[in-house]
Amino acid sequence: MSLSAEQKAEIVAKYGRSENDTGSSEVQAALYTAQIDHLQGHFKEHIHDHHSRRGLLRMVSQRRKLLDYLKRKDVAAYTALIAELGLRR
């Protein structure tokens, strides 16, 4: 199950540069982080759900690519985002 529209709107409002900013790297990485956190709870109950685990690994990889891009372009925004999301990078 994915995030609800309200949850996505909260993330966009918190990390976006404007109200309708859904394309910036910060917003996309935050959305991926929320989806990954949701799926980790799913896997605690459904250990053998390998099909969804593949989707999780794809999301983790895509988030890593976005964060690497952000680190190259704006180191200050990268470090602030990592601290706010609570990621170990």
Swiss-Prot record:
Source organism, top-level taxon: Bacteria
Gene3D superfamilies found in the cross-reference section: 6.10.250.3130, S15/NS1, RNA-binding
Keyword Mitochondrion: no
One protein family per Pfam: Ribosomal_S15
GO CC terms, sorted: cytosolic small ribosomal subunit
SUPFAM superfamilies noted in UniProt: S15/NS1 RNA-binding domain
RNA-binding found in the keyword field: yes
Keyword field: Ribonucleoprotein, Ribosomal protein, RNA-binding, rRNA-binding
UniProt record, GO biological process: translation
Molecular function in Gene Ontology: rRNA binding; structural constituent of ribosome
InterPro entries documented for this protein: Ribosomal_uS15, Ribosomal_uS15_bac-type, uS15_NS1_RNA-bd_sf
Role this protein plays: One of the primary rRNA binding proteins, it binds directly to 16S rRNA where it helps nucleate assembly of the platform of the 30S subunit by binding and bridging several RNA helices of the 16S rRNA. Forms an intersubunit bridge (bridge B4) with the 23S rRNA of the 50S subunit in the ribosome.
Similarity comment: Belongs to the universal ribosomal protein uS15 family.
Complex formation: Part of the 30S ribosomal subunit. Forms a bridge to the 50S subunit in the 70S ribosome, contacting the 23S rRNA.
Protein name (database record): Small ribosomal subunit protein uS15
Organism field: Psychromonas ingrahamii (strain DSM 17664 / CCUG 51855 / 37)
Lineage summary: Bacteria, Pseudomonadati, Pseudomonadota, Gammaproteobacteria, Alteromonadales
Protein's gene: rpsO
